[in-house]
Amino acid sequence: IRIGSFQRLFYHDDTDGIDMLARHVARHYYADTNGGAVVNADAETADLLVDLLQAIAGRIAITAGNWMAAGFVHGVLNTDNFNVTGESFDYGPWRFLPKFDPGLTAAYFDQTGRYAYGRQPDAAMWAVCRLADCFVKLVPKSTLEDCLHGFYATLESALAKAVQRRLGIAFDNADEERDAMLARQLFTAAKASDHGFDQIFHDLFGGKARSAGYDDDMWVPLLDILSGAHLVRPNALQHPHFNETEAVSLTIDEVEALWAPIAAADDWQPLVEKITAIRTMRAALDGAAI
């Protein structure tokens, strides 16, 4: 069920249909595993739509924040590319960043950079606003606007958490300003650097530079913040994955190189090896032993 599913009903002025679909979404996608309703499917229509909008917006904000931390470019982000659970899906010509580049696009037809990596937070917010539009005949506009005030804060919080997760670190105390600054300083340094985006996380895993190339002044603010962090799992760096010099990545050049032997000779071995490397990285990040 996509944001576009609600837009279709709104286009046809089907407020009963919007109410019915909203209750279906609340009942089947927003009830927790213990049976307690996250969004009450039996609430009055206005209350239901407000709660549902906040819930969907929150999940989409978290997904968009995770995209940014992963260096992921979805490719096409119209309202049919966002679903009501906030799950990442319906990929077009996706990409992962080779190097940090806010202007990187994935779709050949995206001549203006509408869906560029750095514009994904705004594209996500735009989609959520279009969902709010669908409810304007049932909920006061000002109330709907209030529901979305926390969108960017939620996204930035998710981004900050995902950056720390990729680095395998944590801090002893909660500090949202510090966490946001860490992500900001990492992106600032990455933009000025020649290092690959995935390589940076690999090299700085654990909060310290584990290879050369991080002595320039541009890394100092980031490393200063990281100096106050600790490994989430003290033995994490003992995993064989972190003995590798090169980070595991999946840029478009790598994808095409993996596809070439398949197309030419039905040779799947390079793809099998890449999948194995990705699974090994996942095990390392999750703390599993090899």
What are these regions (language model features)?
Residues 1-74, 85-173:
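ATP-dependent phospho-/nucleotidyl transfer catalytic cores
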Residues 79-80, 84:
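Catalytic-loop Lys-Pro-X-Asn motif of eukaryotic-like protein kinases
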Residues 111-290:
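Regulatory N- and C-terminal appendages and interdomain linkers associated
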